[in-house]
Amino acid sequence: MERSTRAWMSIVVVQAMGSVWMCYAKQNSASHYTSTLPALSRAHALPLALLCILRIVLIFDFRNFSIHIAHILLSILTAIHTMTEVFFYQSMSYGIVTVTEVTLNSFSVVVMLTFLLSPSFKNEQEGKEKRARKVTAKHYMEGEMLTPEDDDELVQAYKKWK
């Protein structure tokens, strides 16, 4: 399950990079905005870029619960932001770019929540807990090992030599 969700994250990262590129490219900057002001596109690119960076961090540190929560919250906020820009403020046009962005963010939230609530995530977390170590070998510097008995033949040979 982890491998599939990581693969999904890499697909969504590529999509987010494309959305950020569209916000900064001159020929396509007004393709999803009703106004042709480049400031609107750049303002929309910031949460997309932050979400893209967070997803890249999540791919490399996939077992971090707090990054998962931050990713889920930022995905929800980005989807809500895009929907309010389209339907409430009507500053963005309803098109393939905005629909894809909202759909992929919403689906990412569902996929990540499914992964976080799955037993495979919980089993890996339980396996990483610290447990008491068993003694596998006795150290020679402990206890009576520093003072050998006098009847030992190595001790007697040392005394004769000295």
Swiss-Prot record:
Transmembrane annotation, as ranges: 7-25, 40-60, 69-89, 96-116
Deletion phenotype: Hypersensitive to the acetylcholinesterase inhibitor aldicarb. In a slo-1 (ky399gf) gain of function mutant, restores normal locomotory speed and sensitivity to aldicarb.
Keyword terms of this UniProt record: Cell projection, Endoplasmic reticulum, Membrane, Transmembrane, Transmembrane helix
Localization annotation: Endoplasmic reticulum membrane; Cell projection, Dendrite
Membrane protein topology class: Multi-pass membrane protein
Signal peptide: none
GO cellular component, one term: endoplasmic reticulum membrane
Tissue: Expressed in tissues including muscles, intestine and neurons.
Similarity comment text for this entry: Belongs to the ERG28 family.
Functional summary from the UniProt entry: Promotes the translocation of slo-1 potassium ion channels from the endoplasmic reticulum to its final destination at the plasma membrane, probably by shielding from premature proteasomal degradation in the endoplasmic reticulum. Maintains the levels of slo-1 potassium ion channel at the presynaptic neurons.
The protein's name: Probable ergosterol biosynthetic protein 28 homolog
Annotated source species: Caenorhabditis elegans
